[in-house]
């Protein structure tokens, strides 16, 4: 348990979508350790309920493509804890692993955009609805480092994540007048239990040698954006990619230079 001095979200209420696993679960656990009351919104009921049991958190079943579900999740946070300080729009899917536009199905494109972008739109809309009267709040969405560097990403995924960045910036302009900050965090490849010990994977997906991005690292970035430490940060796309987005892998002259 973080000490009182280090509990950066003490007294705050956070709603996290897609919090039953992955980045969302890591954020739920981290936010809770830092004093936040956490509402977990997900479609994976059993996994989410187990996390709630661990954290003493609240669970609400939520399909982020359905406005009623998202509205209910936000209302649950307010009715249970009296307010909503932090909205983390994290629910997302990658879609089919098809990389050529000619092989991309419209049905998959729509499905990915519905979850990744429409879900963020609905979460932002309803979080703003309850935050505006209080003239404060932090809305954070999970985008992707692929928005900063094209790298053979499936079209549905990359289009949805670019949309998240655009939505974030536009909402930041509007919400700034109400004292509400809107940002997104853009991770690169996140190691999973199956890949984190694979040397090839670590080398391929890391520019910072010896470092591999984990869900916990992304949660730490979200914690910063959720906390008062980032009180003057809004409209920002926080890249958590180890510098990959600024590096041209096909023309890395530093590897050719003498030391």
UniProtKB/Swiss-Prot annotation:
Transmembrane segments: none annotated. Substrate binds at residues 144, 157. Residues 1-30 form a transit peptide. The keyword NAD applies. It is found in: Mitochondrion. Optimum temperature is 32 degrees Celsius. Optimum pH is 8-8.5. GO terms for cellular component: mitochondrion. Belongs to the short-chain dehydrogenases/reductases (SDR) family. This is Borneol dehydrogenase, mitochondrial. The gene is BDH.
